[in-house]
A protein has these predicted regions:
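A short mid-domain helix/strand-loop element embedded in enzyme catalytic domains
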Residues: 7-42
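A general structural-boundary detector
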Residues: 5-6, 23, 95, 139
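Glycine-rich, often acidic-flanked micro-motifs
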Residues: 32-34, 38-48, 61-181
Length: 181
């Protein structure tokens, strides 16, 4: 029986490491990403560096006050039937809740600072490579690593993934979530 994600209390780094290592057994992965809940849907902005994630979180807070930043650091993506839900990593954000009320995942954007903002859809193979590169994988457990790869593959085939080069400003938000606030 796979582990449940419902009652999580992480008090040490070792607890967090065990939690991240157990995610693939539950069909979930941890991703270095800023997560935003916009119109009851999660939008993830994945980046290796924390600076662009923080920049995006700041833009959401400034220009889309009705949206909620779930986390600037790491998000958990887990399956619910044929869809995925996203919630803040409880190791990073004490309020991260894996409950059934966490928002469904609408898109994953792999973000890069740039002088001009552009959005480019990714083929599944490129999205899979990026998702794995920016995930917390359960090394050195080979079986759980295979489960993580399989989960990531399902995610990129069901959730739109893009490369998002962005210049900080309102335009980047208009591209990924047109304003109607």
């Amino acid at each position: 029986m796979p582990p449940t994600l419902s009652c999580i209390r992480l008090s040490t780094l070792l607890d967090a490491r065990f939690f991240h290592s157990s995610l693939p057994a539950a069909g979930a992965i941890a991703l270095h990403a800023c997560g935003v809940c916009h119109r009851n849907q999660a939008i993830l902005f994945a980046a290796r560096s924390p600076e662009p994630r923080h920049t995006l979180a700041t833009l959401w807070r400034a220009y889309r006050p009705s949206s909620r930043v779930l986390s600037e650091r790491r998000m958990i993506v887990r399956p619910t039937g044929s869809r995925f839900r996203a919630f803040a990593d409880p190791a990073e954000e004490p309020g991260g809740s894996p409950g059934w009320d966490s928002p469904f995942l609408a898109a994953i954007h792999f973000i890069y600072p740039a002088s001009v903002t552009s959005l480019r859809p990714l083929p599944h193979s490129h999205a899979l490579a990026r998702l794995l590169a920016w995930s917390t994988l359960p090394f050195p457990d080979l079986e759980l690593t295979h489960q993580a790869i399989a989960t990531a593959h399902v995610i990129v085939t069901r959730v739109p993934c893009t490369d998002l080069e962005f210049h900080p400003g309102r335009r980047v938000l208009d591209m990924v979530a047109p304003a109607t606030d």
